[in-house]
Amino acid sequence: MTEHTDRERTKMSDTQIKPVRTSKQAKEEFESIVGQYLESNPIISTNNKTSELEIRFGTNPKVSKPINKMGYDNVVKQLYACGFKPENSRGNQILRIQNEFVDTRTGQIKMSNIRAEIVGTDLIQEYCRTNNIQKVIDMPSTLFNKIKFTQKMSAVDSKGGYIRKLDMEDFNFRVSYQTEQDFNVQSGLSRNIISKWTDSKKLFRSMNRVRFYHDEYPIFADISIVKGSKRMNRIPVPQYTIQEAEVFSGQESYEIELEIDNAKVGTGTAYDNAARLMTDLRKCIRIILSGLQESKYPIPYSEQEHVLQSYMRMVRGEGYQTKRIYPKDFIGPGSFTLQIENVIAHIEDSTIVSIRDNYCVTEKADGDRKLLYIANNGKIYLIDTNMNVTFTGSKTNEKTIFNSLLDGEHIREDKHNKYLNMFAGFDLYYVNGKSVREFPFINYLPPIETDENIEKGEIVAKKFRLELLSELIELLKPISILETSSNDEVEPKENKRSPDLIVKCKGFNASSEHGNIFNACSKKLSDINDGLFEYTTDGLIFTPMDLPAGGNTLNGSPGPLYKSTWEKSFKWKPAEFNTIDFLVSVKKDKTGRDEVHHIFQEGRNMEGNQEVIQYKTLVLRCGFDERKHGYLNPCQDILNDKLPSPEDLDNEDSYKPVPFQPTNPYDETAHLCNIILKGDETNLYMMTEENEYFEDDMIVEFKYVMDNDDGWKWVPLRVRYDKTSELRAGMKNYGNAYHVANNNWHSIHQPITEYM
């Protein structure tokens, strides 16, 4: 057997994937592939050659976003929740290497379809040290199953034709039936590759793989964190050594696969026909998709895109041209942190906003900010701040509220960590396709007469958003569109109230009803302290009663139709809950390496009996735009003749990450933070309080502890994987914007207490 002839005969490129025209055709092709796999009697292995049927998720980045850390974690949670167990919760460390070879027939250099696989941290470390696979083979700890060579080939059907891979684009996974043949390191083919090892360029893939199994399903779930060879124009570049390939300095990617357990299927087992195996395959596919979409009711990605484009048409009007959707298209305005100057009485001719004038207050739930969108067919969806769509599994039959948009908090668990799945609405933007953003929030004036000619069933006749929101939720009456039948298949079910999704209207205490805003706050805080809310709360939200949504003037226009911060809306948290999201980078020495310091050098012992404590110093950065936030060094700009011009107003490149330099109180070292390194003798890492590893160019949420020594006041709480994935996808997400970070800094140092 020769490497190049087998490759020419059997390797299938991604361009030869089975073309699919309809969903029905795709399902039939899927079942056909499963049937052909079972006909091969996969329980039997011949000459170390086995059949392999796998399903890989997130294969087409044009259909859905690549799988990120949040998707990875959500799938793990879903697997555990559905009874899957890991073979090894720490996972296996695997290094896979493919070599280039010269095709003797054409003289061209090609990439082999045979890969070397090294398993185990000790063996991988030895390879990284030597770049010599023979030295790894010669190690005493090398066992026969720790290193091998594997050739994957496309399977053939009964007529000798290749069985092509199948892309199920609706849910963005690929079905692949292949044969896999292993060769030990002493085989002729392996020895031939080893003999040319140092003279051939290679592609590297380093991964941590955790395999999950289920007692009732003949299916493995493999989840992997992968780092590979450096890419150029998205194509991996072969190199001679793993160091030249820059494998470990690259960005992590995440892979999720299902693979059939050959030992449990085929002749003589309960899974001897395609229909039986397909039933369990569909269940496991649904489990993975539920994790990726954070929903019990995964939907096609085409449906998600349709929902987003329908949302945009409603918001932007009929003139809207279909475009790519970005997080900035979330129209719910954010809130500023409440400061002491916002609590004092309004000063004449001052531009400072006071919550004493026409404000109401509600509790801030510990949930995720989302929009609830009622589509033109009554289906109810949630849209998060990153414009990810989740189907709730519910719909409404009330046609007068189709094409409506609510703003609120999605609360997954109650305060006892039990499943809740509640949407607590706090604002309303569109009803039946018509904007109500222009209306005031609460009726703060004496009753006014309404037009008698307004159609009775049209709730837009009322002119206050909270009143409309309350009535819309009364009309909503969500019902489930699904019900599990006796054969465990999902069937449509009409007119059944949903036991899953709860939609409620949050309660607001108005200053006009309680005498003043302080009495309104006192009542709300009493309700919180008395445990009247079934969910966890972490503060208060103050909303102007008399202004349009996001607007700043009475009877004026509402706010912009993109992500923004509403200067008239405020949030209050107890000081200990005020945090800032920073983009972190480690201080470097003159050689470009991370600076590592030792506690004993400064005569300080942090952990008692530990002799030497090592730490790194971080530079904390936030997003800064000179057009909005001022100038970092205006005097130097003038000296350098770097003056602003009108063209700068439309310069999208002006938003950039800069070290955090707060103004009130000013602290020139506020952007520096020391982090203790944790780990074992050989590996030391920066960790958050939630025991999450983090590194350069990640966005991390920090709290500020006043009592800590200088340099140690910032404490990392958790990694913001959502924001980090946006940054690494090329978006301008650098943590909190400067004005938000500066506002929170001021609130941390001059906190407003519950009793003020």
Please report, for each region that a protein language model flagged, where it lies by residue:
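Nucleic-acid 5′ end/cap handling module spanning
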Residues: 46-48, 53-58, 134, 140, ...
